[in-house]
Curated annotation (Swiss-Prot):
One of its GO terms (molecular function) is monosaccharide binding. This is Glucose-6-phosphate isomerase 2. The active site is at E359 (proton donor), H390, K514. It holds the Pfam family PGI. One of its GO terms (biological process) is glucose 6-phosphate metabolic process. Keywords: Cytoplasm, Gluconeogenesis, Glycolysis, Isomerase. Catalyzes the reversible isomerization of glucose-6-phosphate to fructose-6-phosphate. The keyword Isomerase applies. Its EC number is 5.3.1.9. GO terms for cellular component: cytosol. Pathway: Carbohydrate biosynthesis; gluconeogenesis; Carbohydrate degradation; glycolysis; D-glyceraldehyde 3-phosphate and glycerone phosphate from D-glucose: step 2/4. It catalyses: alpha-D-glucose 6-phosphate = beta-D-fructose 6-phosphate.
């Protein structure tokens, strides 16, 4: 029991009921469940916005879902959700509100933080972004030499990179193809080198994304980009203001860098980095797709926000997806979760979800600071189909691990493809549907034998099935649909964190390595003695210096 008198999660009757249910359920056979309920394939579906969600191929019964709903009620998921939407400080370790939902609220909404409606601030920044994006897109904004901007390079890291980079790839078919967009995040100098090596400085705009303007990787890359620009434009310091803008709140450091603070786009402490690409952090995306399509994306986010906030528990899609994740992770022993989009344009979607999910729920203490006695966030992984089918699907089909998976697909290819390329879409989606069937129902030894397979090969060609999947299907990938998908996963992650009683909105795990890196760097560059360096790391530092030719 916690100090406040609350029963800890694993000691609640609802948790105990699920443990008992898991024992009684035994081995779940999807073939048997579908045979017993012919309507399962059509009845176990939900819809939110443009997303058709099929959860029939999961290792759950009606009783499982009912018990999970009781767990959600007992752990106060809806209360914490409502507190988040109200602007309460639910990020307890940093004493901050969590209001990424305000970033896509309509102009007439009222959402208060400490008694102040933040929606007018949000729309003021969006309007400022739109004005700037239009000036770049039309050629009104020119560089130092008077030439129009044709290249945009976003420099950020974490949420300042993963979100806009993912969304740009997802919405390439909606971008202005006359503009080249690149994203730099790695402090490895090769990242910036490859991003700018074929660009003309006179036509290149850099967007520096750092709330504090002190993020070491971002400012290191920004400083190198500044040197590259000045070297290419004759060294005139005035050029910086025409080729750099900032996504930040630190006006002093932005000005010191040479950026005009009139071209600084702000965001707020109640926006976490991994939830931020629909804020000023998305400026590069807005330049690429235009303000109108950016707003369509925000409307897609808001649609799912409202669904999550108002839909009854039994038809609430993010709640359902979160509960299924808790079922597999906390009761069936699953350690990972695969997200498998059958769309080339979603090639960076799973990498984006890795930060969203693992940085949020990769925690081992609860909100009271006590070690958890239950499994929390899974390892999230995956790549677009059909590539994965020729790589790791073997392990999912016939390996020894339980790996729940989400399959995301679209009924229509993007319009700009040729008719011949559009015709390939049916083959792509045939694989999409075939894989979920194969994972669910497998292939029995008798079915293998019926094909005349030699007996010694029968075990090798048998597929056990009973691998759970969620299928998410939409008509086509549009800005609105992308917003809906991202919001769906945002709120799924929220649900799981609420049930596990962890703070899903801090990320202290990234801090220790940063601190140690600052201490280690002088040992690499100067050979300085670093107090507290363990023998293994000390030996590795010495080996590094020798390989670098430093004694």
């Amino acid at each position: 029991m916690n100090a406040d008198g609350r029963t800890r999660l694993h000691q609640t009757p609802e948790w105990a009921a699920l443990v008992k249910h898991r024992e009684q359920l035994g081995e779940v056979r999807l073939r048997e469940m579908f045979a017993a309920d012919p309507g399962r394939g059509t009845g176990w579906t939900l819809r939110v916005g443009d997303l058709h969600v099929d959860y029939s191929k999961h290792l759950v019964t009606d009783e499982t879902l009912a018990l999970l709903q009781e767990l959600a009620a007992a752990t106060g998921v809806s209360g914490l959700r409502d507190a988040m939407f109200r602007g309460e400080r639910i990020n307890i370790t940093e004493d901050r509100a969590v209001l990424h939902t305000a970033l896509r609220a309509p102009r007439d909404a009222v959402i208060e933080v400490d008694g102040e409606n933040v929606v007018p601030q949000v729309h003021a920044v969006l309007d400022k972004m739109a004005g700037f994006a239009d000036r770049v897109r039309t050629g009104e904004w020119t560089g130092h030499t008077g030439r129009r901007i044709r290249n945009v390079v976003n420099i950020g890291i974490g949420g300042s990179d993963l979100g806009p980079a993912m969304a740009y790839e997802a919405l390439r078919a909606f971008t202005d193809r006359s503009l080249t967009l690149r994203f730099v995040s790695n402090v490895d100098g090769a990242d910036l080198h490859e991003a700018v090596r074929d660009l003309d400085p006179a036509e290149t705009l850099f967007i520096i994304a750092s709330k504090t303007f002190t993020t070491i990787e971002t400012i290191t890359n920004a400083t190198s980009a500044r040197s590259w620009l000045l070297a290419g434009l004759g060294g005139d310091e005035k050029a910086v203001a025409k080729h750099f803008v900032a996504l930040s709140t630190n006006a002093e450091k932005v000005a010191d860098f040479g950026i005009d603070t009139a071209n600084m786009f702000e965001f707020w402490d109640w926006v976490g980095g991994r939830y931020s690409f629909d804020s000023a952090i998305g400026l590069s995306l807005m330049i690429a797709i235009g303000p109108d399509r950016f707003r369509e994306m925000l409307d897609g986010f808001h649609l799912v926000d409202e669904h999550f906030r108002t839909a009854p528990a039994e038809s609430n899609v993010p709640l359902l997806m979160g509960l299924l994740g808790v079922w597999y992770g906390s009761f069936l022993g699953a350690q990972s979760h695969a997200v498998l989009p059958y769309s080339h344009y979603l090639s960076k979607f799973t990498a984006y979800l890795q930060q969203l999910d693992m940085e949020s729920n990769g925690k081992s203490v609860d909100r009271e600071g006590k070690p958890v006695q239950w499994q929390t966030g899974p390892v999230v992984w995956g790549t677009p189909g059909t590539n994965g089918q020729h790589a790791y699907y073997q392990l999912i089909h016939q390996g020894t691990k339980l790996i729940p998976a989400d399959f995301i697909g679209f009924a229509r290819p993007v319009d700009e493809l040729s008719e011949e390329l559009k015709s390939q879409h049916d083959l792509l989606m045939a694989n999409f549907f075939a894989q979920t069937q194969a994972l669910a129902f497998g292939k029995t030894p008798d079915e293998v034998r019926a094909e005349g397979v030699p007996e010694e090969l029968v075990p090798h060609k048998t597929f056990p099935g009973d691998h759970p999947t969620t299928t998410i299907l939409a008509r086509e990938l549009t800005p609105s649909v992308l917003g809906q998908l991202v919001a769906l996963y945002e709120h799924k992650v929220f649900v799981q964190g609420a049930i596990w009683n962890i703070d899903s909105f801090d990320q202290w795990g990234v801090e220790l390595g940063k601190v140690l890196a600052k201490r280690v760097e002088p040992a690499l560059t100067e050979g300085a003695d670093v107090p507290g360096l363990d023998p293994s790391t000390g030996a590795l530092v010495a080996a590094y210096r020798e390989l670098r030719g430093r004694r």
